[in-house]
Amino acid sequence: QRYPEHRIVGEEGGSSGPAAAARQWVLDPIDGTKSFVHGVPLFGTLIALLEDGRPVLGVIHLPATGELMVGAQGQGTTVNGRPVRVRATARLEEATFAFTDSAPLHRLGLTSGFLELQRRVRIVRGWGDCYGHFLVAAGRADIMIDPVLSLWDVAALKPCVEGAGG
């Protein structure tokens, strides 16, 4: 109501505001719904601001860990107010690789590449949804593969990862 010229798009709530708005807020109140429903604490809330279709601000809140990541274009990325950077892992064999659901990769015929990547990295973990992307931006993991993403899944992640140097 305060900014009627802004558009709001949400995974759960549809959209409101002018379709051609220069500023658009993209919300995912529970990213990782399956984790949330099953009591797995790897879910979060995603908020993004797009200006002229480009993500310029991203927020990832992980309630279970009490961590809040904020990434803004030209401002860097912080976790609970402290700057973070992606890791500078020099070799694939030293990398930590996270992924969500591998079934879409198999359906797309990417099984051999997926298995080869798993063989070459140091650690493989199934840390899904925003949690895995959070870990990459915070410098705690190196690679995250999430083969099925919608606007509300990725809009907040982009400024966070890029602001951390990724």
Predicted regions, residues:
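N-terminal subdomain of lithium-sensitive/metallo-dependent phosphomonoesterases centered on the IMPase/IPPase/PAP
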Residues: Q1-I30
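Short, Asp-centered acidic motifs that coordinate Mg2+ and/or phosphate
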Residues: R7, L57, D142-I143
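Short loop/edge segments at beta-strand edges and connector loops
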Residues: G10-E12, G81, G128
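Acidic active-site catalytic centers that drive phospho-/nucleotidyl reactions
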Residues: E11-E12, D28-D31, S35, D142, ...
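DPxDG-like acidic metal-binding loop motif
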Residues: A19-T78
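Short, solvent-exposed loop/turn motifs
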Residues: P55, P83-R85
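An extended, acidic
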Residues: R85-G166
